[in-house]
Every structure is written in C-alpha cells, then in structure tokens.
C-alpha cells in the first residue's frame, strides 16, 4: 500500500511539473523573455491609445491584440518560420500552423488590403475630384514624401525593398502600406503598420503646423468658387475610365485601384445597393478584424525591438510631413498660373495624403481660423480622394521597380 501511495504521489508531482513547464510563465523564465514582456507592455499601451484616446481604434485595437497574442509564450498562434524568406513554406505549413498563421495568408497573398479597398471605394464620393480635376495634381504632389523618404531610407542602409516599404508610410494609407510591405519586406510589416495607422490618427496634430508654416494669412483666406454639380453618368464612367487607364499604364497597381473602383461603381450605379451596403459594413468590418490581428501578430520581439524600428518611426513621420508639404507647395505654384476665383487655397493641398476624411477635415478649421466664412471641406475632399488613388499608384510604381 505504501508503494501505491508513493507511486501516486510521484505521478501527481510529475503531472504538476509537466503542467508547470507547459505554461507561458515557465517559458518566460526559461527563455528570459524580456523582449516578449516589453512587447506585451507595448500592446497594452496601444490598446490604451485605441480605447481611451480613440487613435484609429478600428484597426489599432485589433493590431494591439494580435501583438499581445503573438508574444504570449506557448500560445503558438503565429510562427515566423513558416514565412521565412518572404515565402510561405507550404511543406511544413499544415503540420505547424496556428490560427493566426492561417489568417495571415490573407495578408501575405494581398487579399485583405484589396478587400478593404473595395469597401473604401463604396464609401468614397469622387464628385469633388471630378468637379475639379486639378485636385489630381495635388493628390499626386502629396506622394512626394513617399519617394523622398525612399531615397533617404536607402541612403541610411536599408535595402531598396525595405526603403520602398518605409516610404509608402508617407501616403498615410494603412491598407496600401500593408499590401506593399507584405510583398517587399514582410519582416517590417509590424512596425510599418503601427507607424502608418498611428500617424493617420495624428493627422490633426502633424499637419496644422506645417500648413501654417508654408502659407501666409492672405493665402489661407482665399475663397474658392463653388464646385459644379456632377452628373450620375460622370460618376459611373469615372471608375471605369480610371481602372482602364491605370491598369494599362501600371499593371502592378491594378489590384488596389481595380478593387477601389469596383466598390465605387457599386455605390454609384444604384442597381446593387445590397452589395454596396455589404462591402461598406459587414465585409469591411470582418476584414478589418482579420487584418488587424494578423498584422499585429507579426510584431514579435525579434522583429520589433531593434534600432531599425526607431528609424522606421522617424522616417515615417518625415515622409508624412513631406507629403503634406508637397501638396501645399504645389497649390502655391498653381496659383501663379491662376487668376481671380480660379485660385486655390493652399490649405487644401495638405489633404492630398490619403487619410480620408481626416486630412480634409483638418483643412476646414485651419481655413476658418483665417476667415470664419470660408468653407473648404468639399474643396479639400477632391485632393483627399485623389490621394487614395495616388498612394495606390505610388505603390504600383514601387512594386514595378522593386517587386
């Protein structure tokens, strides 16, 4: 009987020891996981920003939670080795993959960003852009930050593919940044996604000082003439024409631009309201959850806690600032060739970055500070939606050279 009790006690102790060794706490102690602890703290900080201060909460909350899950020892939800070298290792995928590995395929294969662009297109009104085609130039000028930062990042020692992924932050377009980075430099996906969405949330903080610095009070008081009405036929033809032109000139931009214009055509044609509402709401919400979780899962301690992340954050805000400045400065140049009520208020140039509609909403109060009777919101929406197309085209250009 004594032997039976001893045997039972040993079994219980061994079971408890096995259980203790399988816990995440044991993993932290055994591996001295200070990196994981720091990343868990970063995840909680981002959750705080999303919940308390509403910084891009729809995506920042899910990104932060994905970051939390991937850094919990022993969870085995995401495995970086399955995607090492920028490729999916299908030979070992099924045997080792966790939940987030399967969901990450939507990022790796470029599915989620394109589906989000369908939803964005269905929520976008291109009327102000059609009514004032000059807005296309302001949207293009705001992509200046992308290419200047690409050059700067390359000069600092990043590879061309990494530099391109960092530069795209300047477009202030989260899905485009994720789409391009997943192809060119997937190891940087976590830091770049966090930077892109953080700076989008900080548009009202970053842009106004630059706008005021580059404009005079007289320029900020410029009143623009009312936009002409845009017919339904124009709104239907616009996505079709843009899709054909961009797909022929820059095929690498066709997935993003094509999905954007598909969503917009659903909205404007008026015959598929059910589909339009679905992509604006249900589809968009589901994809945002999957995208945020899987992008956050890539932010492991090894990928995030290094000096390169600091460079990415600094270069990202520089790219965003230069994009803002590019739009404002081109508007000032265009005014040299404009007369009377054809002049452009340079404040709307800053809306050329594709943070829709935050950038356009920043132009409005800045204009009213100079003249309370000035209303710039609809004028600013033209460059703003042009910036969405512009950032997708910029990504296509980088892909065609670096992909």
Stretch-by-stretch model annotation:
Residues 1-84:
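N-terminal alpha-helical transmembrane segments of multi-pass membrane transport
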Residues 33, 129-150, 302-328, 380-384:
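Entry/N-cap segments of selected transmembrane alpha helices
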Residues 46, 104-130, 263-266, 284-306:
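Hydrophobic transmembrane alpha-helices of secondary-active transporters
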Residues 51-60, 78-79, 102-103, 123-138, ...:
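Interfacial helix-loop-helix linkers and transmembrane-helix boundary segments
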Residues 108-109, 117-123, 138-148, 152, ...:
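Alpha-helical membrane segments and immediately flanking helix-loop junctions
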Residues 198-271:
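Membrane-embedded hairpin module used as a gating/binding unit in multi-pass transport
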Residues 243-331:
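Transmembrane helical segments that form the transport core of multi-pass membrane transport proteins
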């Amino acid at each position: 009987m004594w032997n039976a009790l001893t045997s039972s006690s040993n079994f219980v102790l061994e079971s408890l020891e096995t259980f203790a060794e399988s816990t995440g706490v044991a993993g932290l102690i055994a591996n001295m996981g200070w990196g994981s602890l720091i990343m868990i703290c970063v995840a909680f900080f981002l959750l705080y920003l999303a919940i308390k201060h509403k910084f891009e909460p729809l995506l920042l909350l899910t990104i932060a939670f994905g970051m939390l899950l991937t850094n919990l020892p022993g969870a085995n939800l995401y495995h970086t080795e399955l995607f090492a070298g920028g490729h999916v290792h299908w030979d070992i995928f099924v045997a080792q993959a966790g939940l987030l590995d399967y969901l990450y395929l939507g990022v790796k294969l470029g599915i989620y960003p394109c589906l989000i662009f369908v939803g964005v297109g269905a929520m976008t009104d291109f009327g102000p852009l059609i009514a004032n085609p000059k807005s296309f130039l302001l949207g293009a000028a705001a992509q200046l930050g992308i290419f200047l930062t690409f050059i700067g990042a390359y000069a600092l020692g990043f590879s061309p593919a990494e530099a391109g992924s960092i530069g795209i932050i300047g477009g202030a377009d989260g899905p485009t940044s994720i789409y391009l980075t997943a192809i060119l430099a997937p190891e940087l996906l976590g830091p770049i996604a966090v930077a892109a969405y953080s700076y989008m949330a900080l548009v009202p903080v970053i842009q106004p000082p630059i706008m005021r610095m580059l404009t005079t009070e007289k320029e900020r008081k410029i009143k623009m003439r009312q936009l002409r009405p845009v017919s339904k036929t124009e709104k239907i033809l616009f996505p079709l024409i843009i899709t054909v032109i961009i797909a022929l000139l820059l095929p690498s931009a066709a997935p993003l631009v094509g999905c954007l214009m598909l969503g917009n055509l659903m909205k404007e044609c008026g015959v598929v309201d059910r589909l339009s509402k679905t992509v604006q709401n249900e589809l968009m919400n589901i994809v945002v959850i999957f995208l945020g979780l899987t992008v956050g899962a890539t932010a492991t301690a090894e990928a995030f806690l290094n000096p390169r992340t600091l460079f990415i954050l600094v270069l990202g805000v520089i790219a965003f600032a230069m994009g803002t400045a590019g739009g404002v400065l081109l508007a000032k140049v265009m005014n040299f060739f404009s007369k009377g009520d054809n002049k452009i208020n340079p404040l709307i140039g800053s809306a050329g970055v594709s943070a829709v509609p935050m950038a356009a909403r920043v132009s409005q109060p800045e204009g009213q500070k100079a003249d309370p009777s000035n209303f710039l919101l609809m004028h600013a929406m033209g460059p703003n939606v042009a910036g969405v197309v512009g950032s997708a085209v910029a990504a296509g250009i980088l892909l065609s050279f670096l992909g």
